[in-house]
């Protein structure tokens, strides 16, 4: 089992604070905010698959935005009343990493949700590297594209 110090060393200070203490990276600073390459996004802590580039859109909010996770079972939702707001926190199912929040102001044609996710909680696996990185089973997501 990885200790907190080992995890922090492996993923970095910002990713550690975001995933383990529900911190939020500053808007428009994350690596994946304005990034639209073909591939999947995984939990930086556990490597569990979370989102696809097929469901990513430019919301203008300053963080990566997705209309849905690859499968709903991959994330869990939790009420969040911090900072005097009522929001729904999104965590990864396996590791329980804080990812961000989900809002109901997403594209209507894609279900109406906007998963506003911290780049620091994610690792991007390019389509061309998915098989090599152990994510071959998810290649079929892109068969129609």
From Swiss-Prot:
Catalytic center residues: 116 (nucleophile)
Keywords associated with the record: Oxidoreductase
Domain MsrB: 4-127
Gene Ontology molecular function: any one: peptide-methionine (R)-S-oxide reductase activity
Alphabetized Pfam families for the sequence: SelR
A GO term from the CC aspect: cytoplasm
Catalysed reactions, as listed in the record: L-methionyl-[protein] + [thioredoxin]-disulfide + H2O = L-methionyl-(R)-S-oxide-[protein] + [thioredoxin]-dithiol
EC number: 1.8.4.12
GO biological process, one term: protein repair
Family membership: Belongs to the MsrB Met sulfoxide reductase family.
Name under which the protein is recorded: Peptide methionine sulfoxide reductase MsrB
């Amino acid at each position: 089992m990885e200790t907190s110090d080992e995890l922090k060393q492996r993923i970095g200070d910002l990713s550690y604070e975001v995933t383990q203490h529900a911190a939020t990276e500053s808007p428009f600073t994350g690596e994946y905010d304005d990034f639209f390459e073909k591939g999947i996004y995984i939990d930086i802590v556990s490597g569990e698959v979370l989102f696809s580039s097929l469901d990513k859109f430019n919301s203008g909010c300053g963080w990566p935005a997705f209309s849905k996770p690859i499968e709903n079972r991959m994330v869990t939702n939790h009420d969040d009343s911090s900072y005097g707001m009522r929001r729904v926190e999104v965590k990864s199912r396996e590791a329980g990493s804080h990812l961000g929040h989900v809002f109901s102001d997403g594209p209507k044609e894609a279900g109406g949700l906007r998963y506003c996710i911290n780049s620091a909680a994610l690792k991007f696996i390019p389509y061309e590297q998915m098989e090599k990185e152990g994510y071959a089973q998810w290649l079929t997501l892109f068969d129609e594209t």
